[in-house]
Amino acid sequence: MTNTPSDQPLKQVNQRGAARLAAVQALYQMDVGGTGVLEIVAEYEEHRLGKELDGDTYLRADASWFRSIVAGVVRDQRKLDPLIGSALQDDWALSRLDSTVRAILRAGTFEILERKDVPVPVIVTEYVEIAKAFFQDEEPKLVNAVLDRIAKQVRGEQRK
């Protein structure tokens, strides 16, 4: 039996967690719609982070954390994508992945590389939870496995 999002218990989200979720959404929007980084960051800060939009209230998020992830992924994408590609199974290309999964993996990989002050288990868990918000089956497992492989390669550690 699969759970719909309304069947799952709500977890309290911290401001960094909300920033990560917003960053994944922004990266997805940039990937699919071709929106530029300055435009997307301004849109999220002015209309989404902690704001009400179309009857939905967005979570309060750490705006500087959000900006750091989005700008960092865009800046470092040529470094991130090969790392992600090498952590995928041999017969999978990054381009074959769903745009949301790509956004999650890019953001998680960026944090593993650049945010040495954040423990790997925190990063991996946060992005697996984001994957679970969008997918119910294999995608969260894929996110977990790929980010674990990248963490081991980059930091020499795995999620415990």
Swiss-Prot record:
Disulfide bridge positions per record: none
Molecular-function GO terms, alphabetical: RNA binding
Gene Ontology terms describing biological process: DNA-templated transcription termination; transcription antitermination
Summary of the function given for this chain in its UniProt record: Involved in transcription antitermination. Required for transcription of ribosomal RNA (rRNA) genes. Binds specifically to the boxA antiterminator sequence of the ribosomal RNA (rrn) operons.
Annotated InterPro entries: NusB-like_sf (IPR035926), NusB_fam (IPR011605), NusB_RsmB_TIM44 (IPR006027)
Gene Ontology, cellular component aspect: cytosol
The keyword RNA-binding belongs to this UniProt entry's keyword annotation: yes
Family designation: Belongs to the NusB family.
Protein name: Transcription antitermination protein NusB
